[in-house]
Amino acid sequence: MAAGGQGGYVFEGSDGVVSIEAEHYFCKRDAKEACWTNIPHMGRTLGAMALMPYTKPTDGAELTYKFGGIGGVKTVKVHVVVKSTLDFQVKGGMTYEVSLDGGDAVSVNFNSRLNENPENVHSVYYPTVARRVVESTVTLPVGPDSPHTLTLRPKDPGIVFEKVVVDAGGYVPQFLFGKESGKRVAAGRR
């Protein structure tokens, strides 16, 4: 595992899609006692980002991603792909927040049913563990300015982010969640 790198990436979507590997963030903010860490080769395509250590609070931590090239759409569907982490705190699921362009954050509880309860074991638990990821989708309004800023905020420790896909109407579901979109490093970021 490695510290979370330099950031500064700005993505350019095409055909109504922006696909972003979690480790290619624009900016990261660590929690007071936990730092963003890149986990190479975790995930289906490149790596993943998680706060370490898992035993510390996540208050104030966030990853931000910048992107353009989605046209004049009013809303987008944001697909967030995380590792299929179990609710090891046994609190009814683990959550993160997603926001776009400074708008209201949407809370996502991605693993509330990822357990061995009889009603979930065959329909949710086994298939999810076999896939090794959980994909959650939220619809968010798009601000007027580009590049756009997408923010992920873990509310619980142990969440491992693998990929983000912004769908402005062109995304076709696929196993690897699309080839990563073109990117550049913002001036003055390296």
Regions found by a protein language model. Name each.
Residues M1-R190:
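Extracytoplasmic
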